[in-house]
From Swiss-Prot:
Family indicated by similarity: Belongs to the UDP-glycosyltransferase family.
Record function comment: Flavonol 7-O-rhamnosyltransferase that catalyzes the transfer of rhamnose from UDP-rhamnose to the 7-OH position of 3-O-glycosylated flavonols, such as kaempferol 3-O-rhamnoside, kaempferol 3-O-glucoside, quercetin 3-O-glucoside, quercetin 3-O-galactoside, quercetin 3-O-rhamnoside and isorhamnetin 3-O-glucoside. Is able to glycosylate the flavonols quercetin and kaempferol to yield quercetin 7-O-rhamnoside and kaempferol 7-O-rhamnoside. Shows a strict specificity for UDP-rhamnose as sugar donor. Does not act on 3-O-glycosylated anthocyanins.
Gene Ontology MF annotations: UDP-glycosyltransferase activity
Catalytic activity: quercitrin + UDP-beta-L-rhamnose = quercetin 3,7-bis-O-alpha-L-rhamnoside + UDP + H(+); quercetin 3-O-beta-D-glucoside + UDP-beta-L-rhamnose = quercetin 3-O-beta-D-glucoside-7-O-alpha-L-rhamnoside + UDP + H(+)
Protein name listed in UniProt: Flavonol 7-O-rhamnosyltransferase
Residue ranges of coiled coil: none
Residues holding UDP: Q18, S250, A315, H332, G336, S337, E340
Consequence when changing H21N: Reduces catalytic activity 5.4-fold
Effect after changing W335A: Reduces catalytic activity 6.5-fold
Span of the signal peptide: none
Effect of D356A: Complete loss of catalytic activity
GO cellular component, one term: extracellular region
Amino acid sequence: MTTTTTKKPHVLVIPFPQSGHMVPHLDLTHQILLRGATVTVLVTPKNSSYLDALRSLHSPEHFKTLILPFPSHPCIPSGVESLQQLPLEAIVHMFDALSRLHDPLVDFLSRQPPSDLPDAILGSSFLSPWINKVADAFSIKSISFLPINAHSISVMWAQEDRSFFNDLETATTESYGLVINSFYDLEPEFVETVKTRFLNHHRIWTVGPLLPFKAGVDRGGQSSIPPAKVSAWLDSCPEDNSVVYVGFGSQIRLTAEQTAALAAALEKSSVRFIWAVRDAAKKVNSSDNSVEEDVIPAGFEERVKEKGLVIRGWAPQTMILEHRAVGSYLTHLGWGSVLEGMVGGVMLLAWPMQADHFFNTTLIVDKLRAAVRVGENRDSVPDSDKLARILAESAREDLPERVTLMKLREKAMEAIKEGGSSYKNLDELVAEMCL
């Protein structure tokens, strides 16, 4: 892992506090550290644990942390510092709260000697409006990171009604460069579209798929079942590709009706399964910390205990998807989950819910024919009989979507090998930070 210059950069990393953003951003940070950079990561106190694995792998000389208090906000309950603890509509309040980190960060940087200032800020695109201002004040390069694909970017940025995301788009396009968690051979036409139509420059680096840097680490919270027990359960499954993994990411909570339909489908299908059920979200009201719970039907877990495993809270998703027993994945089609499923070589069953899930579905299901759609949106309730049939058939190795996905997997793994497109882009990114 070499760069084109002998100087190694000092990079200030500012991730967005939601696991779908934080985790790939830290995976990217690991790759930058491997290339000789010194990194300082800015987080708030309750997000500091995300950095434990990086701390264990890199020396304090090269990996540093800057912990600033989470700015209070009237619409965010006390003690909440991550979006996954809130419903998605709270994102505007999270943006507002995090923008108040501008002044404390400026104060911190102002007290540093010039030799200790970073060469670049690698910040979340979601925070780019105020990160760019900080970078400009200290003549530092601001490079934006988006953990999504170029197709989604090209669709979102082409929409006329972008509401409050318009400021994010503008700030991202005005930053020094853009890094995305995709690989060039997956979507070359869309990478070129973003580069030529939306950016004021050609500095876009596809660096994916960004893979976990340490197996078995806690990458998202607490689990009701230890990863070792999950692994042992999978090891006990006699047939390869016989288990369906069901998970909808860090933000999605199913309604009671959706949960009942899914439970019925799993039971009717007779397939082996692991179902990750999310923690409840806090309401967006600082005076009301009550929660809305998912409702697993009474008696379900007892009836399926010989074939199924229900995990409440965080699940070791990467480990599950890469296990030989797992053959398919019922997913919301969040981009990180798509890449993890692709690398794991499992059949993707798409139930898009919100935001970029629909753009990902267009790319993966409609354009690339590498997944099967089983749900329509956040409000849809699947027919349990139909879903049961799809689940039962999803382990078939001759499904055309599985064959296509495996070809994409080969391209993904080539991209991150030494000499591959994403590998070289990471080298170039680190070199560019020093120029």
